[in-house]
Amino acid sequence: MCEANVYLLRDGRETLVMEGVYIFKPEEEAGRVLLENIFGEQKLVAAELDHISLMEHKIILR
């Protein structure tokens, strides 16, 4: 499977935003990201990409 869990990095700590994400789409308006998981749930997050760990299946936002 190619899903990843998305975390928000604040003050050096990672907080889970959504599990099983398979769509990660930056919005045209800077600073927002649309996430969709394997269950069809969507979330619009006010954050930007920090980094991606393919080995750990993690997407880190800031």
Model-derived regions, located:
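Compact, glycine-rich, soluble single-domain proteins
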Residues: 2-10, 15-62
